[in-house]
């Protein structure tokens, strides 16, 4: 299919872009000590530029030390400028154009700051300090020009400082920058725009990121006010508006990094309504993962350009594959947000990752060819085993995948049974097709035994046999009636009825609850000894409250099931007096979703050890965990063969 609109050129001031695709600024966490740029961040951007992206926007850069969170780059001195030059050089060498997102975070939570920095106690900005910040935006713009960027973006969305000035409930001021009028609320942003323009060449475009809708705050900027501001911003020197959605002060956070719960293009009606009333190009943001949708939105005049973010994290060749009619080869984002968001807020994570692309942020390593091609036995055709085989083949090895069941897919097929998660099933089926396309044999219906390993004599073995259900040790559970396993429910082998209790509030338990609601079971309670939504990730947990408000799905946290009787459970919890109390609760159906346990693998690893065959155990076969851990293990194992 041809996507002529998507891949048509567009000119912003003096900059001509070869297509309408923008890689938006996204936090990668690849910043080093002293704001240094290593080899990883330039390689990350070079991969997307070489993949055909029209404009790469480098993530948030802080304009001053006071707002410099350790997660982000800075751009307020010449050292920063010289470090960022590494990124622009890499993008240009790969045939792309480079933009940078210039930022002041405003009310940034304390936990985002490096504790070694001594930060002043937050206080009301004086007018003098506001003027200094305006100048600092201008100086960052000057440094960005010197660093070789082709375009600049002023970040004014997501309750960062510019948004805080514009929003009538966040702006508490009573002076000329206060909330008495729209002109006052917009004054700071317009001053920043003019100051940045003064420090930029006449032919260099200035973009601005805004929210297409201000929401879930005590008071909001209306659409009429947003349109008025955009028109003022255009007069002040903004050449295109990048319309996003979401804020860090409410449940609207979910719109900033939209998970699979939101439909692709969920923000486009808001954007189109604004575009119809402004006279500068509009960049549309809103979980666009399909080139056909992106092209359609541009053809229909709803947007002029499209931000393709997470889709290009999952596949840096998204643009080239789309343009060349190879859409079926695109490794698609599934909207899990486990790597691109959860790893951002995980202090242990060194950088973002991706379930579908475990090489994300590791592009600089390439795919080194081995001195000798090895015959590798991959045991298990789930998400981990298939991914390992793909990377092995790409490097030049000869993998063969063995699967005990009659079809590939593993637990990712079941994961796709929950509402709005079809992309998970599609992803693992894509992996199976990709293996076939690459010439990798998948032998189904074959259980690998130590004897088979001895017979085949592979050079290397990767065990990816996954995990299986093991019933929890609860008195009475083994004899109770109307007890089901979540795995069987999702597979369609069983359907609970009536008043249903789900034991286990992790991802499987919560998604089973969603599955049951979708299939007409109206009385569902999820119980967990810790919290409901455990290990689901922050954004997907938030969607439990958004999509299933109130008592739609009842939630009981801190509840430990101590016994199961005749359609009755006994559970213990700690009351407000901090005393342990036991109670009983009736059920018509009880669903066990307490998690999985790794399948036994010692017979396989022992056989490999006896034969002197190197062996790696990966994913849930090593430790029952999330899909993102399985694919990360798969990549690491494949790279080490």
Task: Report the location of each language-model feature.
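Feature representing long, continuous alpha-helical segments
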Residues: 268-272, 276, 352, 386, ...
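Flavin-dependent oxidoreductase catalytic cores
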Residues: 1-379, 383, 388-394, 399, ...
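Rossmann-like dinucleotide/flavin-binding elements
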Residues: 373-402, 443-457, 464-480, 484-538, ...
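Rossmann-like dinucleotide-binding cores of NAD(P)H-dependent redox enzymes
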Residues: 401-437, 491, 513-561
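Short gly/pro/ser/thr-enriched loop/turn and capping motifs at secondary-structure boundaries
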Residues: 249, 312-315, 407-409, 491, ...
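SH3/SH3-like beta-barrel fold
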Residues: 569-571
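Short beta-alpha connecting loops at secondary-structure transitions
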Residues: 254-260, 304-305, 413-420, 618-623
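Flanking helices and flexible, charged tails adjoining ferredoxin-like Fe-S electron-transfer domains
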Residues: 193, 363-371, 381, 387, ...
